[in-house]
Regions:
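Internal intein/HINT superfamily modules and their associated LAGLIDADG
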Residues: 1-228
Length: 228
């Protein structure tokens, strides 16, 4: 569709190919694109009860260690809102005492979450290293509200906010896990957003490592953390 003065138009492919881009006079050698398609509406999901609150699971997948039987999450202590994040995690658990404060290592506070070992094991997540993490199908097909909370938990940890100077803010997510990245991209699209995927391989600490990234553009703010 082409958009002129906030009006949607339906155009055939032949017409689009003729003038879909024009030269950018303010930046020689680059182009501006004349057409765009509107964001879709979110896809309805299932209202099946989830074993772990979606925000908590998102936070664990984003910044947690689940290679052992008890998940550990870390929250940066150089952010003013880290106590608020811990309080939010506690509010989403059946018992706030399940969150135990641990030590502070290199500017990050570590917390151990008790009582979720069985649930994580049933979801196939216990024992997963960073490169093996994934979003369980049950959560990908859950309700719109649950998917939004899951995405918020993921982005509140490893998400990066787009520039505030841009009219259309595009956030990004980076992970060592291709499966987790793919799941996040699916989440964004199922919520009516746009997401593109890419990857980058670098030589670091004596070996090659690959980061899997996706861009995120939504009609709403997907973050819950204030500083984001």
């Amino acid at each position: 569709s082409g958009k002129t003065k906030d009006r949607l138009r339906t155009l055939d492919t032949e017409t689009l190919l003729k003038d879909y881009k024009v030269e950018n006079k303010t930046a020689p050698g680059t182009f501006k694109y004349r057409y765009s398609t509107p964001l879709t509406v979110p896809i309805e999901g299932n209202y099946t009860k989830l074993p772990i609150h979606p925000y908590v699971l998102g936070f664990i997948l984003g910044d947690g260690c689940i290679s052992g039987n008890r998940p550990t999450v870390r929250v940066s202590t150089n952010r003013e809102d880290w106590p608020e994040i811990v309080d939010r995690l506690r509010s989403y658990l059946p018992d706030p005492n399940l969150v135990h404060e641990g030590t502070e290592v290199r500017g990050a506070k570590h917390f151990r979450i008790h009582g979720l070992g069985k649930e994580l094991k049933d979801l196939g997540l216990i024992g997963c290293k960073s490169k093996d993490k994934f979003i369980p199908e049950l959560y990908l097909k859950s309700s719109i509200e649950n998917r939004r909370l899951l995405l918020a938990g993921l982005l509140d940890t490893d998400g990066c906010v787009g520039s505030k100077k841009k009219i259309s803010k595009v956030s990004t997510y980076s992970s060592k896990s291709e499966h987790l990245r793919d799941g996040i991209s699916y989440l964004v699209r199922s919520l009516g957003g746009l997401s593109t995927k890419n990857e980058s391989t670098r030589f670091k600490y004596g070996r090659y490592t690959t980061s899997y990234m996706c861009s995120i553009r939504l009609a709403f703010n997907p973050f819950l953390r204030k500083y984001k």
